[in-house]
Amino acid sequence: MDQRRTCPWALRSDGDGRSASLLCLLLASLSWSASSSTSFSTFHSEHRDWTFNHLTVHQSTGAVYVGAINRVYKLSGNLTILVAHKTGPEEDNKSCYPPLIVQPCSEVLTLTNNVNKLLIIDYSENRLLACGSLYQGVCKLLRLDDLFILVEPSHKKEHYLSSVNKTGTMYGVIVRSEGEDGKLFIGTAVDGKQDYFPTLSSRKLPRDPESSAMLDYELHSDFVSSLIKIPSDTLALISHFDIFYIYGFASGNFVYFLTVQPETPEGVSNSASDLFYTSRIVRLCKDDPKFHSYVSLPFGCVRGDTEYRLLQAAYLSKPGDVLAKSLNITAQEDVLFAIFSKGQKQYHQPPDDSALCVFPIRAVNAQIKDRLQSCYQGEGNLELNWLLGKDVQCTKAPVPIDDNFCGLDINQPLGGSVPVDGVTLFTSSRDRMTSVASYIYNGYSVVFVGTKNGKVKKIRADGPPHGGIQYEMVTVFKDGSPVLRDMAFSIDHKFLYVMSERQVSRVPVESCEQYTTCAECLSSGDPHCGWCTLHHTCSPRDSCERADEPHRFADSIGQCMSIMVQPSSISVSQHSLPLSLLVSDAPDLAAGVTCLFGNLTEVEGQVVGSRVVCVSPAARDVPAIPVDQDWFGVVLQLKSQETGRTFVSTEFKFYNCSAHQLCLSCVNSAFRCHWCKYRNLCTHDPTTCSFQEGRINISEDCPQLFPTEEILIPVGEVKPITLKARNLPQPQSGQRGYECVLNIQGVIHRVPALRFNSSSVQCQNSSYLYDGMDISNLAVDFAVVWNGNFVIDNPEDVKVHLYKCAAQRESCGLCLKADPKFECGWCSGEGRCTLRPHCSPQPWLDWSSRNVKCSNPRISETAEGCKALPGAFPQQSCSWAVSAAAKSDTAVRRE
């Protein structure tokens, strides 16, 4: 059976002709992992220990290439697996040099994983360069289509890049001039094997994969070579010294590498934990095989008093119009986005406090040019101790230094101590930022930042003074795995490929659909998002039909459509009324509009310019107003007959004036309600009032009681109650007069009342009772009515207070402590608290009397700790300690 028919995507596993059947079974079991969640397509590692290392996307085909431990994968754009190429494990030993694939090795061999350390697409030759950690770091050139091995150069020492088996320490840049063989600039950590591996080199990359010159140094002689090695003296000084290559790129005539390395000051500690690290930007001319153009400067950024110097990741991009303007550069220039952690220690376990910074390449080059000019003027030293081993004085030479200066055989290699400081855009004190990628959308620089906890921050880089604005954060890896350094966009820039050690996810660059209103959409800060008006959706412009027509696509919040209805509410008794809807910022509605009143009814709208006329619901469709409410709201929507989608809405209210039983609540309602004074009725139609003078629509004209002095009525006393009022109506023919209604302990008492004029009414003489002697003062709900049940408003809640002098005042002292407003006194002869008229000609005491002294005072309690003296009267021996409560009970008043 043809293996490729049953497993067509398992094209090739390795170059030794072994059967692909095992690989086919492996891939069949793996294919389920390229699954899709709610938002993301994902691809998972086939073995827990075979973690992912590198990722790149072909900018023409959209194929995704993933370098992992023991595998290189080719995936489709939606992360389904196409090819898996085996790179390990193999029998090896790091001490075998040359590796055993060249000559036998006496060291003990073990099955060793192959860590992918470099994955670069060589576009012009349609091949993939994949370099690993096996066999001292040999590389393979793989055909892009099927990952077939084109060549695996391994027979010369130039073919061994580095045996370091830690990913993220090597970076390569391919430079190719049209019609010529390419060059591979490569920087790598060497793990102390400086004799075997250069830390930086440029190598030949012939078009012919079988060329014997493949990966040879561009220039190599006894005196000059296209390489830099770490001196043994530096390793003797700092045994842990190495240079980690984080990122690299070509821009203009130069190649740049971004590195992190230990500092090498005199007297430095040899402990790895005590090392200070410096992030540096290294520049070489593309056409400088002698490396005379080597310049290395420290770089980082600062916010406030905090320095960010530990490089985590970087990405070369364009600034876009907005960021370019703030940086005073053009939108076509290159800028470098970089992530730094705080400080300069613990590079391998960096602090969570991190920063996103931007460096215009123009500014980097300008600072390098200044450094070159000062050195060629003989100022200072070369400042590259790790490489030169000592301070070397700059040599003065009358050499013009222009923007493309590539060095001479003097004043090289050149270092520096003054850092290139970038512009800090965004900082985060938690969840350290670990990766960065950027692209331009609609003039904005949109930056995507991965974090230690598996999230991606979306940041709009506006530049000074606003910096970077985080407008969204997406959880990509639910297990909280860190986002690795490599991120890449799909060729249409609609997706971002994000990688952790065990998962690759395809994340949409925008999630505009999450915003359901125009205001939410256009205040989100996401430059991708605009409001597609007639589709009533938040989307990118290119997803909105006819977006270029006026008002079809809103990209600022001031362009959101709004609707104003006249009238904005109607009474439940009004039916089929024409409503005028003014729609602002509306597109052409000539295709037709439908009016929807909630789920009540749907009617055709008449479009007249920028207005739409809708007819309100018929009587059968008018909603019922809930009890205890005077209105009910429905959503009035306009639906486009072109798109079938509602595109603008507002609340429309149906109100019921008759829900109001009092004049003040009627005229103070939110609606056009009127009070018919002589009908005691609230209505939306004032013409229904009996008399013109009976129509009220302002609170000042409502009949209402005014507060007066407190109304105090002793129980059993026959007294009138006189009240102040305003606008009291004169009962008309056939209408009954006024009454006062008191609710005394649940019993309604109606008392005839006399209206003196429009501002005064009096409840006629009457007496009132309430039950119980445990209540001395009872506030009674009170109302003035006329014509039986027409209630006069009582906005200040005027009450009648009934009281009993004797209630809870059994002693003389308690009686005399009663509030003077009640006019209670102690009737000594009868031994009770009462009003004076009810006390027979006996001594009657109240607080206004002179020399008041209750007879036979009693001490009911004494202060704690008071002790009567033996043989003494208590009131004499402890009168000074009588408690406040006892004084109240006895009410002793002494001269």
Task: Give the label of every model feature segment.
Residues T38-Y73, L111-E125, K166-D181, F185, ...:
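Beta-strand-rich domains and repeat architectures in extracellular enzymes and scaffolds
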Residues Y471-V483, S562-A586, G592-H660, E700-S733, ...:
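Beta-rich interaction modules in large eukaryotic scaffold/regulatory proteins
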Residues S21-Y123, R127-A130, Y135-V138, Q194:
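Signal-peptide-cleavage-adjacent N-terminal segments of secreted and extracellular proteins
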Residues L82-K86, E90-S106, I121-N126, G132-H240, ...:
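Beta-propeller fold recognition
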Residues C512-D526, C657-R672, A806-K821:
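Disulfide-braced loops of extracellular cysteine-rich modules
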Residues L55, V64, V72, L119, ...:
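Structural signal for hydrophobic/aromatic residues that build the beta-strand cores
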Residues W9-S33, V634-L636:
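Cleavable N-terminal signal peptides of Sec/SRP-targeted secreted and luminal proteins
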